[in-house]
Amino acid sequence: MLPLQVDWRPDDFHLLRDMKFAALVLSCLMAVTVSADKGKKTLSALAIGNSFSDPVWKSMPPVAAAMGCELDIASAMIGGADLKKHWNKFLEAQTNANYRPYSFHRSICGKSIRGTKVNLIEALMTNDWDVVTVQQASHCSMLPRTYAPYGDDLVSAIRKICPKAKIYVQETWYYLPFGAKDLASGVAQQREEHDKIVNAYADFARRVSADGIIPMGSAVQLFRNRLPVVYRENDSGGDVVGNNLSFEKDETGHWRLAKGSDFCHLGPEGEYLQALVWTAKLFGVDVRECPYVAPSVRDPSRAALMKACAALAVMGGREGNRAE
């Protein structure tokens, strides 16, 4: 492990590369300050992760605003990155300030900032963040051995650069059950892997003394149970996970996912659920009263259930998967 170079400074011009950006940041931060003076809840958060965390910089601002909260949120992501990759990218940035492997997007007061490329040191030093979040990649999130030492080292480095920031861990979710040999096995596997994921994140959060867990995986599982999601061989049953799903029959006449189907990531409705969970956890508000519903959620009863599941997950509710 290389010693952390706390005196390292990013190229400010790279992040504030035009006056329009700087003016927008200044005006929005002034608005946040005024809101704080008026008693509104304010928060700045940086999400370090991959495609399982990246949607929040777009989906969370309208939910937070609807709850009367001021939000400055950014995402630093590399597709598919696990904690080991994040740590290795951090070490590389310590010796090469021009190494910028992360896509960086930010929304201040609901206004999106043009995306750029950064390294983690730049992302962490861009703002005096209130919260920094980390997560494990979904494909290994159920394996406790994959969290150490990389996640521990990463959290330690974050604390040295952002000593005032609270550290939160996003708990990820398990996939749709269509990758197993049959649907029944897939549903059983989903239940088992979800429990392993929850336990692995809890152990990691305790070990690094995280300030909290953002229980997104638990919220997804609660929604699956409470709807309830009823899977069929060619139907995802209303799950909030999955994109561009289509099914085809194989040579034996059995249904399978067609090429190009995404059975891992959140669908548009799932991104709304994620925004509810993050808002509830980070701001400490009851999102069951949230007046905003994302355009992707057309059924009021589903929207109400998502709000309830988000609130329950944040309050500590946890269930194994009973979907069939």
Predicted regions and their residues:
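Conserved SGNH/GDSL esterase-like catalytic core that processes O-acyl groups on lipids
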Residues: D54-D153, A157, L176
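Short hydrophobic segments within beta-strands
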Residues: L46-I48, Q170
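Sec-dependent signal peptide recognition
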Residues: K20-V25
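Residues that mark the start of a beta-strand
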Residues: T42-S44, D72
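Alpha-helical cap/lid subdomain in secreted, periplasmic
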Residues: T116-P268, E289
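Conserved catalytic region of serine esterases and O-acyltransferases that act on ester linkages
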Residues: R232-E324
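Hydrophobic h-region of N-terminal signal peptides that target proteins for export
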Residues: S27-S35
